Amino acid sequence: MSSLARTTRADVVLVGAGIMSATLGALLRRLQPDWSMTFVERLDAVAAESSSPWNNAGTGHSALCELNYTPQRADGSIDIAKAVRINEQFQVTRQFWAYAVENGMLTDRGFVTPIPHASFVRGARAVEYLRRRQQALAPNPLFAGIELIEDADEFARRLPLMADRRDFSEPTALNWARHGTDVDFGALSRQLIGFCVRGGATALFGHQVHNLTRESDGSWTLLIRNRRTGEKHWCNAKFVLVGAGGDALPLLQKSGIGEARGFAGFPIGGRFLRADNPVLTEAHRAKVYGAPAPGAPPLGALHLDLRYVNGKPWLVFGPYAGWSPKFLKHGHFTDLPRSVRPHNLVALLGVGVTQLTLLRYLIGQLRLSAPDRMRMLREFAPTAVDSDWELTVAGQRVQVIRRDRRRGGVLDFDTTVVAAGDGSIAGLLGGSPGASTAVPIMLDVLQRCFADRYRSWLPALKEMVPSLGVTLSDEPALYEEVYSWGTKILGLDELDEERPK
């Protein structure tokens, strides 16, 4: 091991202070309170990048309203498999939050708010699709009570802002799921990391991991630099999680693990319009997703959301895609070119050839003017006034590109866990569905990276997630039990008391 002015040691180092690192840290603090733990965050606060509610494309979503998760098959039937899988994952996350509140790990449950989720379409063919979607989802316990709303008066009762001056001569419909949520993942991350620090963890803010080297004993030595003073030190860790958002790919590449070979990243930015006028926020009490535009990536479907940021209600509309070679909102313009390696060049070029529709979509988005953006907003809220809305720049999403024998490379919009074969290091790539499924993703990390301990941890994990290992959509009685428990503990009864059983 090289020597510098200072060397520290930790059982676990978590790179990044967002929701992924916060979740794994909280799980490990509960499972192994005797382990030493260090968070290393390049910015000066928790959740200042992708986990911030202003940088997160969707907050609290669980496949209730996102139409790209329920594609139509060639025969006209609806494939709900992905929606069910994501909702199953969200239920795992929701149970852990309830456990954390019940056991004092989370002292303020205001990070999650009950808000209906809705899908919104226009045109006869789209309405028919939404009808079949509702018919396909409703029998599943996880989607019980999802409604199809075609009546204009009922539409106006549910969504006054969207109904005002709308021409209902065109067929218009909603799928409405009253048991949705809004989640401030920034507030949640701060509480989870606070719990870890109270238990003895160290949190280094304004510090960046510049390199990491595997030692002969299987541990990792990280070179960490204080971004304010320039001081450097080494930290030796038995396990490393690279939960650094867009910075994960470069760090995994520096680690040299074979499992990271062939992966590349394609950054997609986002911008939103937002408004805090109380008249508007009172007139739109839901998250409403439209149908994805042709060529748009999954995270590109336009939606008009009510969000709570630090307890304050906002309306947020977008995203409008942006592009930058940066892998982080606060990153560098050299991030993309510096990530290119001989082993991922073919994958990058393959995507460049096969994703022409996506490229055309991005070019079109970059050419949007302020009037264009307001015109798109008025498709959701016809009476929108320019002066009520301001444009805000969201975070970067580095979508995964993986090697493909036939096409060279494919663009993957899911979250991918990359772990070394010996379990000493793991990293998170990709962006969707992301934060809402943080707990099952981290449980996967625990199982893959701590295989020798996982079996002994199972009793404690099943206390945290009572349905662990069970497919809830196949066990409606258990689902109702854990759902009702979580609803009560998280204080989500407000809109849930009339949820159909």
From Swiss-Prot:
Its EC number is 1.1.5.4. One of its GO terms (molecular function) is 2-hydroxyglutarate dehydrogenase activity. The gene is mqo. Keywords: FAD, Flavoprotein, Oxidoreductase, Tricarboxylic acid cycle. Its cofactor is FAD. It comes from Mycolicibacterium paratuberculosis (strain ATCC BAA-968 / K-10). Pathway: Carbohydrate metabolism; tricarboxylic acid cycle; oxaloacetate from (S)-malate (quinone route): step 1/1. One of its GO terms (biological process) is tricarboxylic acid cycle. This is Probable malate:quinone oxidoreductase. InterPro entries: FAD/NAD-bd_sf, MQO. It catalyses: (S)-malate + a quinone = a quinol + oxaloacetate. The keyword Flavoprotein applies. Pfam families: Mqo. Belongs to the MQO family.
